[in-house]
A protein has these predicted regions:
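Early-domain small/polar-rich strand-loop-helix modules and first-structured segments
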Residues: 1-18
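Helical "lid/coupling" subdomains associated with nucleotide-phosphate turnover
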Residues: 4-7, 26-59, 65-115, 130-239
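A short acidic/small-residue loop/turn micro-motif
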Residues: 19-21, 144-145
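Catalytic nucleophile loop
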Residues: 98, 123-124
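Conserved catalytic-loop position in the HRD/HxD motif
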Residues: 120
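Acidic, divalent-metal-coordinating active-site segment for phosphoryl/phosphodiester hydrolysis
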Residues: 124-130
Length: 239
């Protein structure tokens, strides 16, 4: 993302680019990054560097999350990208990842004095943050991202176990920690982030003919899960 900050610290997005480099598909199944994947990452960062130079970017930050944290050759990825593009990647913790996401959501939504649960669903991990306004109460990082689960549960190789059932078992293992952090006080806002969440929003709009892809009710979410659970991996991709 390339942005411009004004005197009031408002951010105007100038360009938003997303390139598909699947680090997690290597790391969560093999424990390391293949040379081809590292090369794809180098090429992506060369593209980012070109865009940044065109805009005259003065400050830049690049961060990597769970896949780079866990890859046995994660340091090689950092070195290769730095050598190719001059961009230094910072490998951040799950807690720092959650903090940055919280900052972004607070900036985008009016969360003043509201007790909020933020759920970021990434490829390798899920971060759950409880906050009140701008103050973070607790943050937990769970190793149950979408790419990790697909690799571990072997969905693409026709696993005999229903995908939805196995995912629910993973989620149930984390449930008591989330309920502990929430406590007795009611959650007023639940906000989810990540590419998969955006797809859920678009799918909800398509199936239920809604006006917006930004809001999903609990009943709609339950129906979406039930429908997706009945589909094969290939059918989910086509959806």
């Amino acid at each position: 993302v390339v942005g411009e900050v004004d005197e009031a610290w408002r951010v105007n997005t100038l360009e938003n680019i997303r390139l598909p480099v699947r680090l997690g598909q290597d790391v969560f199944s093999k424990g390391y990054l293949e040379q081809e994947t590292i090369q794809q990452t180098e090429e992506a960062f060369l593209r980012f560097k070109h865009v940044a130079d065109n805009y005259g970017v003065q400050r830049m930050r690049a961060v990597a999350t769970s896949a780079a944290r866990e890859a046995s050759n994660g340091s090689l990825l950092i070195e290769r990208v730095m050598s190719a593009s001059g961009i230094e990647i910072e490998i951040i913790s799950g807690e720092e990842e959650a903090r940055l996401i919280h900052l972004a959501v607070v900036h985008a939504l009016n969360l003043k004095n509201k007790r909020t649960m933020l759920i970021d669903i990434g490829g390798g991990s899920v971060e759950v943050t409880i906050s009140t306004g701008q103050n973070i109460i607790s943050t937990e990082s769970y190793n149950m991202g979408t790419v990790r689960l697909l690799e571990k549960l072997d969905t693409r190789n026709n696993s005999k176990h229903p995908f939805g059932k196995l995912v629910r078992e993973y989620a149930e293992a984390a449930r008591y920690r989330i309920e502990r952090d929430i406590g007795a006080e009611k959650i007023q806002v639940c906000a989810a982030t990540g590419g998969n969440v955006e797809e859920i929003g678009r799918l909800r709009q398509k199936l239920f003919k809604g006006d917006s892809d930004r809001f999903v009710t609990l009943d709609e979410l339950a129906e979406l899960i039930a429908r997706l659970d009945r589909l094969s991996y290939e059918e989910r991709i086509r959806k």
